[in-house]
């Protein structure tokens, strides 16, 4: 088998991508501290057509060298905004009709393999801090939670890995 060359991949231009239909999904970063993790969010959101990234609290924002290092330019193709707090972001997204879903190990969470996305619903997926996860004040006001099934002793994934798993599943179900 031969690997495809970049020019054979049929990649859209930045303008074509900007005009393309996106999934009705916003990735909300609740105080994600690593700029490299944030860059990975941008790259993954670009790959799966996520409409927006909301950077909250201590989360770094573009332009940032560390974000660019992992985003590889996807910070230019994915729309983003900054909010001083995740609670402010949630309030705005809820007022716009988004269902607020924490990606977290929470009582009553739905395992990702059991989650069924509604194609008529808009989703705001809350991804938490690398150490503390989704803040409890945020968890207290979400509409639901999705948990990624795991079998190892850590029961913990890097936040950008979690984003890849969940964004892929949303893409698979909503495309």
Report residues per predicted region.
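Post-transcriptional modification and biogenesis factors for structured RNAs
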Residues: 1-175
């Amino acid at each position: 088998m031969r690997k495809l060359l970049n020019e054979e991949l049929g990649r859209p231009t930045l303008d074509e991508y900007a005009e393309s239909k996106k999934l009705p999904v916003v990735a909300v970063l609740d105080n994600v501290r690593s700029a490299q993790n944030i860059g990975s969010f941008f790259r993954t959101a670009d790959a799966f057509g996520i409409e927006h990234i909301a950077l909250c609290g201590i989360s770094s924002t573009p332009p940032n060298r560390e974000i660019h290092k992992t985003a590889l330019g996807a910070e230019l193709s994915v729309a983003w905004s900054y909010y001083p707090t995740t609670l402010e972001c949630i309030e705005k997204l809820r007022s716009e009709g988004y269902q607020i879903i924490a990606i977290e190990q929470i009582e009553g969470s739905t395992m990702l393999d059991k989650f069924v996305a509604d194609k008529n619903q808009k989703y705001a997926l809350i991804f938490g801090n690398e150490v503390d996860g989704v803040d409890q004040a945020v968890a207290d006001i979400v509409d639901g939670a999705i948990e990624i099934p795991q079998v190892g002793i850590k029961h913990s994934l890097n936040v950008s890995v979690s984003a890849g798993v969940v964004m892929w599943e949303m893409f698979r179900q909503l495309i």
